[in-house]
Amino acid sequence: GFASMALCCLLIDTMYKFEHGSNATNYNELKYEEMLMTYMNDVFSSLDVARAFYKGIRCGILHSGETQSGCMLSVTCNHIIEVKGNGLDTKINVNVIDFSNRVIQYINDYINRLYMDNIQTRKKFIKKMNYLCDRKSFIED
């Protein structure tokens, strides 16, 4: 579950950069939470839940190799995310399988926006791809 969730968190990080045409390697907690509430608002219906995910799941797993702040991973909970508490005391239990499927759905939705001639999405995609393709190789001829 931890490896799958780590990959989901990295995919969300990457998709943020494609959604915004961003070359930046760092962005802040608020932008991540905004991304979750904008593109997966069926799962992240409040800032409290998005913040708990960012701090307790994403940062916990990617920076410490564990969930934090009372947040947990599961394969048996009945919803993608079960929420307990509110505000700074919000704790979540994330169903790894369902969440992974939701991230895949989000990526497919993004691909569909590219196919559907969404000009802004395409411009930002091109900007990000140009940045990736223009990087100089570390290998000298």
Placement of each model-derived feature along the sequence:
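A structural signal for well-ordered alpha-helical segments within the folded catalytic domains
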Residues: 6-9, 13, 30, 52, ...
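Histidine-centered, metal-coordinating catalytic motifs and their short helical/loop contexts
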Residues: 47-74
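Hydrophobic/aromatic-lined pockets within catalytic cores
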Residues: 16-23, 40-44, 62, 66, ...
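Short, solvent-exposed segments of well-ordered alpha helices
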Residues: 2-3, 45-48, 90, 94
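Anionic, Ser/Thr-rich low-complexity intrinsically disordered regions
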Residues: 15, 20-28, 46, 68-75, ...
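Short, contiguous, well-structured surface segments enriched in hydrophobic/aromatic residues
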Residues: 1-38
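Amphipathic, Lys/Arg-enriched alpha-helical patches that create a basic surface
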Residues: 74-141
